[in-house]
Each structure stands twice: as C-alpha cells, then as structure tokens.
Amino acid sequence: MKQKIILWIGALLLLTAGTGCEKNKDYEVPTQLTGTRWELAGIVDAKTGKITPLAPKGCYGFKFISETEAKGGTVLNQMTVHLTTPPFIGIVTMIGDEENGDAALFYRIIKTLESYTWEKNELKFFYDNKQYYLLYKYSKP
C-alpha cells in the first residue's frame, strides 16, 4: 500500500511539473499590427536561409499607424508601407542618400516586391519570384 501511495504521489508530481513547463519565448508576438514597430534584419535567401544585413544597421524601420499602413524611414528619407497585394513600400522624401550604406540596394528591392507574410514576430516582403525577401523583426517599443 505504501508503495502505491509513493507511486501515485510521484506520478502526480511529474504530471503537474510537466504541464507547467512551456518554452520561454525570447520575443513577444504582436496580436495586431497597429502601433507595432519593425526593424529590418536583412535580406534573406529563401533557399539557404542566409541573412545579409543592410548597412547602416537600424536605418530601415517603420511603425504601423493602422493594420495596413506604416510610416518609417531609411538613412535620410521617410517611407510609407502599405500591406496590399502586392505590398508597397514607397519613399516619401527623396534626399540623395543612395551613397549611404546599402540604401541604393534597398530602393531597388522595394520597387520589385511581390508579396508579404506576417508570422509571429516576423514580417517578410518577397521579391525575385520569392527567391529572396526583406526580413523585418518586431521591435519592442
């Protein structure tokens, strides 16, 4: 009888310990886009998963003002983002910052966007027949 009680207590402890264990997330997952901020992590090769960051770091971000529209900036310019099909990222001001880091490359890419996806803390803008995408990561305010 004593052995059964110990077995039941052990099973109960394992059961309660197992249900309380959830992997800790090292990021937050936004439930809506309005008010969220996103920073460019880089260009991703969809086949290999290799990320190539764009310079200067931290200069290609935006914040959503509605569920489908965001405002942000590049090195020197302001930009708008519209989650349409296809998505649209447009440069509002046109100050010549194409010599700054990878701004010229960024400007070429945003003219060719085909689609986008939003999954958890990642926003992906695909181009070149979905072979590459701009990877944006959710940034805590």
Curated annotation (Swiss-Prot):
GO terms for cellular component: plasma membrane. Residues 1-20 form the signal peptide. It is a lipid-anchor. It is found in: Cell membrane. This is Putative lipoprotein Tanf_09445. A lipid is attached at C21 (S-diacylglycerol cysteine). A lipid is attached at C21 (N-palmitoyl cysteine). Keywords: Cell membrane, Lipoprotein, Membrane, Palmitate, Signal.
